[in-house]
Amino acid sequence: MDSESIILAAKQTGAQAVHPGYGFLSENAAFARKVKTNKLVWIGPSPHVIKVMGDKLKAKELAEKSGVPTLPMASDVKDAKNLGYPLLVKAAAGGGGKGMRIVNSPKELKEAIVSAKREALSGFGDDRIFIERYVKKSRHIEIQILGDEYGNIVHLGERECSIQRRHQKIIEESPSPRVDPFLREQMGEAAIKLAKR
């Protein structure tokens, strides 16, 4: 998508605000800054928040500081051995399943790291990785939040994103048939807590 064309179209039509929808522009801090620089209202997270949350290492650190539960992680082979197998090697930048490798035994770890780093560098220009314990039969649940310029934040429930191919979402469902009201509220409150940080 051409961000310049979007800003030009907004100005030509007299739009006062830009909502990026979903996908690449919604996760692009430079585009958010450009919208604001052009005296338009950006409907979405601040450029700073986009940048921090787009970096899984920084996002995880912020979540931990906010008291949001996270999986233990390691940044190198030596520390990864303490997590137990299976492991998941993950790219710190990007998404869409790129730079992720499941590791079932110690002999697979070094090659998985090399491979994940190579894919991450090629796809995102950033070869940083981290390692977590791989949780089998896990659910990929995303909490939707909405906030205003006055600091009010609410959660809108969750999206079930567990139907995947190669760690890429195929379909999303809301509400999740696997999340009960108590868990939904706990996860929503954790998301709000993180957003307020």
Model feature map: region roles:
Residues 1-197:
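N-terminal beta-alpha lobe that positions the nucleotide/phosphoryl donor
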